[in-house]
Regions:
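A short acidic, leucine-rich amphipathic alpha-helix
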Residues: 31-36
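Short amphipathic alpha-helical interface segments
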Residues: 15-26
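Short, flexible active-site-proximal loops enriched in glycine and acidic residues
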Residues: 53-62, 91-99
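Alpha-helical DNA-recognition elements
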Residues: 45-53
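Short, cationic-aromatic polyanion-contact patches
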Residues: 3-14, 28, 57-81
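Residues in the helix-turn-helix
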Residues: 42
Length: 110
């Protein structure tokens, strides 16, 4: 499961935390660290990455909680980004011209 999420651009820690949030619902960073065994500093860094990538939501409160985005939304967001990148590359990368090998004529005395 983690490897499949990594194909969508998540790090191993982000994927682990995404699964934790998805299975348990909204959690604080402390609770995520406790449930996953990942250090709190790494958890908060990974949670920020998940929010930035659209894989989780930050629920602002006295104690901030995080909620995993629905799988469908995660997949749609990543597919949309890939399609945008594909369109950009197709429109902006010039085709490579095939180089023809030249020939040399040697003239001289035998």
């Amino acid at each position: 499961m983690i490897e499949k999420l990594m194909l969508f651009g998540l790090t191993r820690q982000e994927a682990t935390i995404y699964i934790c949030l998805y299975q348990t619902g909204p959690l604080t960073g402390y609770e995520v660290a406790k449930d996953t065994g990942i250090s709190r500093s790494n958890v908060y860094s990974a949670l920020a990455g998940l929010v930035e990538k659209g894989a989780a939501y930050k629920m602002e409160a006295a104690a901030n909680k995080y909620l995993a985005a629905p799988v469908e939304e995660l997949c749609e967001n990543r597919m949309r980004l890939l399609q945008e990148a594909e369109g950009y590359l197709k429109n902006n990368l010039l085709p490579v011209e095939e180089e023809t090998e030249g020939y040399i004529t040697i003239e001289g005395y035998r």
